[in-house]
């Protein structure tokens, strides 16, 4: 590991498109079902721009499956069944940072994590002085996260490429 954290320009697999149609949702569920290991999960909201705490983008990654950027509002309008998603991930451990922020929105959508690992709680238990996601990622992986879109209006459509890269 170098002394200076490395900023990743974009994901190894490239910047993913948003999954906002029923066929794309079903394809992604199939990808997840045939993949393995833990499920990294995150959600983005538009709290500073809209009333409510609903998720406007949910993000997932699992070994053997691509990065999934899912538009829960568009998928709900299309009739997506989150039970298909739940079956696809099974009892995989969901990895979240500050899960108290994201779990209510996941539950509202119908996602049902069976097992959970919270990296913020782990960082606190390990005695890290800085336990935000960027600090934890830098500490353990030597990677710098770009955080310029963390407070963006995630309800905006279509999502710009640099937001999808975030």
Spans of model-derived segments:
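Nucleic-acid-contacting surfaces of polymerase cores and analogous helical-repeat interfaces
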Residues: 142
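Conserved RNase H-like, two-metal-ion catalytic cores of nucleic-acid enzymes
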Residues: 2-135, 139
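Acidic, Mg2+-coordinating catalytic module of metal-dependent nucleases/exonucleases
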Residues: 145-166
């Amino acid at each position: 590991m170098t002394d200076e954290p490395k900023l990743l320009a974009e994901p190894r697999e490239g910047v993913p498109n948003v999954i906002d149609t029923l066929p794309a949702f079903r394809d992604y569920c199939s990808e997840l079902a045939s993949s393995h290991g833990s499920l990294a999960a995150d959600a983005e909201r538009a709290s500073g721009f809209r009333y409510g705490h609903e998720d406007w983008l949910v993000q997932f990654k699992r070994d053997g499956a691509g990065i999934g950027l899912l538009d829960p509002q568009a998928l709900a309008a299309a009739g997506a069944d989150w039970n298909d998603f739940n079956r696809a991930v099974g009892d995989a451990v969901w990895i979240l940072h500050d899960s108290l922020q994201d779990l209510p929105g996941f539950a509202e959508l119908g996602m049902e994590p069976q097992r959970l690992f919270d990296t913020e709680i782990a960082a606190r238990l390990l005695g890290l002085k800085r336990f935000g996601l960027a600090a934890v990622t830098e500490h353990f992986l030597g990677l710098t996260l770009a955080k310029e879109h963390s407070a963006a209006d995630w309800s905006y459509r279509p999502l710009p490429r640099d937001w999808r890269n975030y």
